[in-house]
């Protein structure tokens, strides 16, 4: 690990008012989907399977959505994955319609990469605190103050913010891309997640200015409470998503994207894991490693009303009923201005090309910003 060349948090930036707690959102957000009973769920799944075939559609789901939706995606030849895997799958699949079960920026990313396809979502109001906390006008004004810096944005942003960037990254490839840019002597603006940005800054030593956004789920993890839980389970491996605060990351055995955490849970020989990310990932972890124990990392503290509230209220808006509605009505479609989509595709495609290069081992062969 390297010492960061420059710690950020030293610039003027407008205070963006976003919800501060996943608990608060769940308590106030009436549209969080109810879990259907078994009979209703089975009926909806059968109807959706038929609709997917009739409409030449495929279901692409994130690890954080309802397990019923995750299982349905796999049963119908779709995809369950992290943001990078979802983007790859949608771009490569032959289906004319993509049903994206996740949050809005994921649907937008699918439309950016596949403008010729119809992209539907179970609920267009499924937002993301990182996206909401990084409005395009304010972020662009900040970037304009530092014209000498390369702009790197997390995938959890709007199409308009992506269009302002030089690079888009997911947590799966953020470290590698920033390391590459640092090797070229580039100074960076990073947005919007301050915890992920600070982690990358510490790991790479890159010169980064950080936007001050955060994920309302990962921001709730508490280092003190995690340390206490770790003391209760000294044999447990601690898996942490890098959107978590530094005090939590410092207690981790593995830091990484949802896919990396899932791989560690399955491949490592240990039998007990403490997991600091959205609880939705536990479904796939338990499926792939049924002989292992998974413990949710604590979010209690600062008045928290539950020991672990780590699930995204907007991801919870995705439902089987919403998928059926989108397929039968043709509504809940992601629509983007053509020029905006083209501008946003450049940095997003740059990431996908870089990620493909990682697999080939030739990531340094001319894949810098155009």
Swiss-Prot record:
<dbReference type="GO" id="GO:0005829">
    <property type="term" value="C:cytosol"/>
</dbReference>
<comment type="function">
    <text>Catalyzes the condensation of iminoaspartate with dihydroxyacetone phosphate to form quinolinate.</text>
</comment>
<dbReference type="InterPro" id="IPR023513">
    <property type="entry name" value="Quinolinate_synth_A_type1"/>
</dbReference>
<feature type="binding site">
    <location>
        <position position="128"/>
    </location>
    <ligand>
        <name>[4Fe-4S] cluster</name>
    </ligand>
</feature>
<feature type="binding site">
    <location>
        <position position="215"/>
    </location>
    <ligand>
        <name>[4Fe-4S] cluster</name>
    </ligand>
</feature>
<dbReference type="InterPro" id="IPR003473">
    <property type="entry name" value="NadA"/>
</dbReference>
<feature type="binding site">
    <location>
        <position position="62"/>
    </location>
    <ligand>
        <name>iminosuccinate</name>
    </ligand>
</feature>
<feature type="binding site">
    <location>
        <position position="83"/>
    </location>
    <ligand>
        <name>iminosuccinate</name>
    </ligand>
</feature>
<dbReference type="GO" id="GO:0046872">
    <property type="term" value="F:metal ion binding"/>
</dbReference>
<feature type="binding site">
    <location>
        <begin position="241"/>
        <end position="243"/>
    </location>
    <ligand>
        <name>iminosuccinate</name>
    </ligand>
</feature>
<keyword id="KW-0808">Transferase</keyword>
<comment type="similarity">
    <text>Belongs to the quinolinate synthase family. Type 1 subfamily.</text>
</comment>
<dbReference type="GO" id="GO:0008987">
    <property type="term" value="F:quinolinate synthetase A activity"/>
</dbReference>
<feature type="binding site">
    <location>
        <begin position="154"/>
        <end position="156"/>
    </location>
    <ligand>
        <name>iminosuccinate</name>
    </ligand>
</feature>
<keyword id="KW-0411">Iron-sulfur</keyword>
<feature type="binding site">
    <location>
        <position position="258"/>
    </location>
    <ligand>
        <name>iminosuccinate</name>
    </ligand>
</feature>
<keyword id="KW-0963">Cytoplasm</keyword>
<keyword id="KW-0004">4Fe-4S</keyword>
<keyword id="KW-0479">Metal-binding</keyword>
<comment type="pathway">
    <text>Cofactor biosynthesis; NAD(+) biosynthesis; quinolinate from iminoaspartate: step 1/1.</text>
</comment>
<feature type="binding site">
    <location>
        <position position="312"/>
    </location>
    <ligand>
        <name>[4Fe-4S] cluster</name>
    </ligand>
</feature>
<dbReference type="Pfam" id="PF02445">
    <property type="entry name" value="NadA"/>
</dbReference>
<keyword id="KW-0662">Pyridine nucleotide biosynthesis</keyword>
<feature type="binding site">
    <location>
        <position position="171"/>
    </location>
    <ligand>
        <name>iminosuccinate</name>
    </ligand>
</feature>
<dbReference type="InterPro" id="IPR036094">
    <property type="entry name" value="NadA_sf"/>
</dbReference>
<dbReference type="GO" id="GO:0051539">
    <property type="term" value="F:4 iron, 4 sulfur cluster binding"/>
</dbReference>
<protein>
    <recommendedName>
        <fullName>Quinolinate synthase</fullName>
        <ecNumber>2.5.1.72</ecNumber>
    </recommendedName>
</protein>
<keyword id="KW-0408">Iron</keyword>
<dbReference type="GO" id="GO:0034628">
    <property type="term" value="P:'de novo' NAD biosynthetic process from L-aspartate"/>
</dbReference>
């Amino acid at each position: 690990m390297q010492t960061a060349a420059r710690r950020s948090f030293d610039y003027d930036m407008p205070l963006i008012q976003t919800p501060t707690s996943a608990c608060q959102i769940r308590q106030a957000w009436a549209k969080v989907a109810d879990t259907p009973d078994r009979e209703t769920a089975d009926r909806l799944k059968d109807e959706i399977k038929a609709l997917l075939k009739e409409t030449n559609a495929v279901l692409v789901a994130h690890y954080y959505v309802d397990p019923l939706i995750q299982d349905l995606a796999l049963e119908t030849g779709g995809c369950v994955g992290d943001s990078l895997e979802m983007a790859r799958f949608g771009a490569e699949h032959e289906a004319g319609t993509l049903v994206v079960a996740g949050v809005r920026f994921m649907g937008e990313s699918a439309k950016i990469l596949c403008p010729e396809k119809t992209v539907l979502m179970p609920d267009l109001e499924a937002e993301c605190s990182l996206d909401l906390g990084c409005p395009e006008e304010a972020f662009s004004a900040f970037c304009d103050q530092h014209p000498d810096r390369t702009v790197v944005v997390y995938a959890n942003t709007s199409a308009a913010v992506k269009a302002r960037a030089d690079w888009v990254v997911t947590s799966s490839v953020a470290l590698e891309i920033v390391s590459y840019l640092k090797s070229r002597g580039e100074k960076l603006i990073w947005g919007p997640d301050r915890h992920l940005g600070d982690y990358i800054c510490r790991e790479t030593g890159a010169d980064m200015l950080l936007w001050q956004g955060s994920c309302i789920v990962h921001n709730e993890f508490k280092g003190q409470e995690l340390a206490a839980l770790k003391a209760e389970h000294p044999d447990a491996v601690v898996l942490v998503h890098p959107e978590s605060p530094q005090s939590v990351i410092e207690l981790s055995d593995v830091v990484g994207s949802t896919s990396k955490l899932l791989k560690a849970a399955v491949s490592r020989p240990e039998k007990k894991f403490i997991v600091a990310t959205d609880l939705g990932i536990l479904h796939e972890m338990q499926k792939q490693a049924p002989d292992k124990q998974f413990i949710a990392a604590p979010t209690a503290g600062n008045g928290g009303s539950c020991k672990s509230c780590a699930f995204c209220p907007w991801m919870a808006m995705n439902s089987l009923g919403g998928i059926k509605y989108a397929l039968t009505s043709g509504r809940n479609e992601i629509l983007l201005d053509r020029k905006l989509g083209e501008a946003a595709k450049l940095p997003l495609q740059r990431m996908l090309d870089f990620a493909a290069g990682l697999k080939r081992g030739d990531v340094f062969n001319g894949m810098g910003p155009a």
